[in-house]
Amino acid sequence: HSFFADGAAASAPSSADYGAFPHMNIITSAFLAARPKTLTASLIPVWAGCMVVQKLTGSWNASLALLTLTSCLCLQIACNFFNDAIDHAKHADTERRTGPVRMTASGALSHRTVMLIGLFFLLGACLLAFPLIELRGWPILAIGIPSLYFTYGYTGGPWPLAYKGLGEIFVILFFGLVAVLGTILVQIGTAPVVPGTLVESLAVYNAGIVTGIQCGLLCAVMISVNNIRDRKEDLTTGKHTLAVRLGEGKARAMAQSFILAAYITLPTSSRALHLNLSHTWWMWIPSILFGGYLMLLIRKTPADSRMNRVLALSSLHLLLYLATYTILPTR
């Protein structure tokens, strides 16, 4: 029940449909297993990284951004397929499930088929990364190799992160900090000064650190909400998410604190991005109000299928947050 595999797919078939799809078309089944509504998690860090580069250097490379995004999408889709198959093999998907139905558990796709499709997308991510490695060298490998492992190791391997209560930390680091800084690395490289400008690369990376943490925190809200929704089922299947370890009340407070932290750090990120917050603070009002409403929903919504709406709104909130950053003028 990872964020990657469930995410904001509130309108997907529910757990009540288990066993209803044994004869579903394989293409339709594979499309649902890819969880397309969750793939904004790959878009966000690439968008954020390019936004940082644009704000501080005045330009960004669309071709490199597209290559980075496509590679990230392949990794996330592979992760979604692995999660679908591995959670079923570990009996973590049951009839009590309140999230979207899993294709392996429903019988729509076999375990072997789902794993092979996951491997196909993993290979695609590797092939797409080769031009980036050729362009930027070993730092891309340093990011890529752990990313490849955790694509499988999120739910698989000897120490699956999702089963150890490390899902939120993983998302903050890899879908926030690492992905944003990786995008910046692809865009500007590691030279002391950004080519064609007088901007120091260190300033761009410093801004990327703050922005990456903010994006990671808001992505982690989605996995926290996901785990609150699935907590009762996870208690019976041995999946020790943070929601299971902390209890429902503390898990809700943690998700709210992630949203709060993303706004408390705005003055720091605004300075790093050369934004004049004192003159443009009013542009944040829609995002702040949305964030406050989301915090209220996280506190009040019952831990069942009604949380799927909160997941969808969490994704929209992240998009609004980053869109606000993007339209703000620099000093």
Model-inferred region functions:
Residues 74-98, 220-243:
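Acidic (Asp/Glu-rich) catalytic motifs at the cytosolic membrane interface
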Residues 48, 57-85, 141-148, 152, ...:
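Membrane-embedded alpha-helical segments that form the functional core of polytopic membrane enzymes
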Residues 95-136, 239-276, 316-319:
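Multi-pass membrane catalytic core of lipid/isoprenoid biosynthesis enzymes
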Residues 19-67, 71, 171:
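Topogenic membrane-insertion module of multi-pass membrane proteins
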Residues 102-193:
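Intramembrane alpha-helical segments
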